[in-house]
């Protein structure tokens, strides 16, 4: 492949692709294509094929040149990565050799004011990765005060969530909250940040974004799907950027790699054989040089595992947190 003039360097890219260990003739899934950084590294490492998925139509359109460069080895599909098993089947790949995922919002999305992901720019309060379904403005306009507080607390880990929700409800009774600046200003009045701390609206924006895009449910389902499509010795590499995501990945891999070891004083309970073997006990984190070049890498954690020959475990139940459908239905 020809090198591109403008290359996107993904966080922990070489490390993630190193865990995948791509081989010639292998089929790999990039569940979160974004700007194509992981996909490009896989294509350059070996004569392999990549099926890349992204729910954002802008990402798919932006990958057209890379599709041409790849000469038939890259297929781009606009879809949610929770559907990766169906996507692979539609591409004639019942099983694959590796899956990589980079969880959360991309730098590209954060830098586009019109997407409404960041309070750094004033733009429409949107936050949708796929451009469909309710926007953040819709949630802010229609969710009850209790639901708003729960969303901001659970998904944003904001301890002042009730104060923020109360302020949002009071403000929207006066005028619709439709821009990122309007929401950030409302939050800043009730969440006081000390010098050197993150912007007071950071956690509220995170909570709304995760909720609007159903990111944690998507992650749960994507991990289950990856387990089903990976062939024996196939590898999974997941990069996460905050504790909510990493906790889900860590728990999933711990459960799937568990090898029994129950108490000898208790009755033996049937337990599914491990479907994964961990590639490292601790997450891989970015080095000082990468963090200096890309501050977003500071919070990144990479976890990897190799598929065993054992059958996939039954998909777990989703946690009982607020759902987009239920909140919007109640807010009518």
Swiss-Prot record:
Pfam families: Methyltransf_5
Gene Ontology, cellular component aspect: cytoplasm
UniProt xrefs under InterPro entries: RsmH, SAM-dep_MeTrfase_MraW_recog, SAM-dependent_MTases_sf
SUPFAM superfamilies: Putative methyltransferase TM0872, insert domain, S-adenosyl-L-methionine-dependent methyltransferases
Keyword Transmembrane helix found: no
Endpoints of the signal sequence: none
Keyword terms, alphabetized: Cytoplasm, Methyltransferase, rRNA processing, S-adenosyl-L-methionine, Transferase
Its EC number(s): 2.1.1.199
Broad EC category: transferase
Gene3D superfamilies according to UniProt: Putative methyltransferase TM0872, insert domain, Vaccinia Virus protein VP39
Entry's Gene Ontology molecular function annotations: rRNA (cytosine-N4-)-methyltransferase activity
Positions bound to S-adenosyl-L-methionine: 36-38, 54, 81, 102, 109
Localization per record: Cytoplasm
GO biological process, one term: rRNA base methylation
Region (Disordered): 295-322
Reactions this protein catalyses: cytidine(1402) in 16S rRNA + S-adenosyl-L-methionine = N(4)-methylcytidine(1402) in 16S rRNA + S-adenosyl-L-homocysteine + H(+)
Function description: Specifically methylates the N4 position of cytidine in position 1402 (C1402) of 16S rRNA.
Family indicated by similarity: Belongs to the methyltransferase superfamily. RsmH family.
Listed name of the protein: Ribosomal RNA small subunit methyltransferase H
Name of the gene: rsmH
């Amino acid at each position: 492949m020809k090198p591109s003039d403008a290359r996107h360097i993904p966080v922990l890219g070489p490390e993630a692709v190193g865990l995948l260990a791509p081989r010639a003739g292998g089929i790999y899934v990039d569940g979160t294509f974004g700007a194509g950084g992981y996909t490009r590294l896989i294509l350059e490492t070996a004569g392999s094929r990549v099926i890349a998925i992204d729910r954002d139509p802008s990402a798919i359109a932006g990958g057209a040149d890379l599709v041409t460069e790849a000469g038939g080895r890259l297929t781009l599909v606009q879809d949610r990565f929770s559907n990766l098993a169906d996507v692979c089947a539609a591409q004639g790949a019942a099983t694959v050799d590796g899956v990589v995922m980079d969880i959360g919002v991309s730098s590209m999305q954060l830098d586009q004011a019109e997407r409404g992901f960041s309070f750094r720019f004033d733009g429409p309060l949107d936050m949708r990765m796929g451009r469909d379904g309710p926007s953040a403005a819709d949630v802010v306009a229609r969710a009850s005060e209790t639901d708003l507080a729960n969303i901001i607390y659970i998904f944003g880990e904001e301890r002042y969530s009730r104060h923020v929700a109360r302020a949002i409800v009071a403000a929207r009774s006066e005028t619709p909250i439709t821009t990122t600046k309007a929401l950030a200003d409302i939050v800043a009045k009730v969440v006081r940040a000390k010098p050197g701390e993150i912007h007071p609206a950071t956690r509220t924006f995170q909570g709304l974004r995760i909720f609007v895009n159903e990111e944690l449910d998507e992650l749960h389902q994507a991990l289950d799907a990856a387990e089903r499509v990976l062939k024996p010795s196939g590898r999974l590499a997941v990069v996460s950027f905050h504790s909510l995501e990493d906790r889900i990945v860590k728990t999933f891999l711990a459960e799937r790699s568990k090898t029994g070891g129950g108490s000898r004083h208790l009755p033996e309970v049937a337990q599914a054989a491990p479907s994964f073997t961990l590639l490292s006990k601790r997450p891989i984190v970015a080095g000082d040089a990468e963090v200096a070049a890309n501050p977003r890498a500071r919070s990144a954690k990479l976890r990897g595992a190799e598929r065993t020959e054992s059958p996939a475990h039954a998909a777990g139940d989703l946690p009982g947190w607020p759902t987009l459908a239920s909140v919007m239905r109640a807010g009518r």
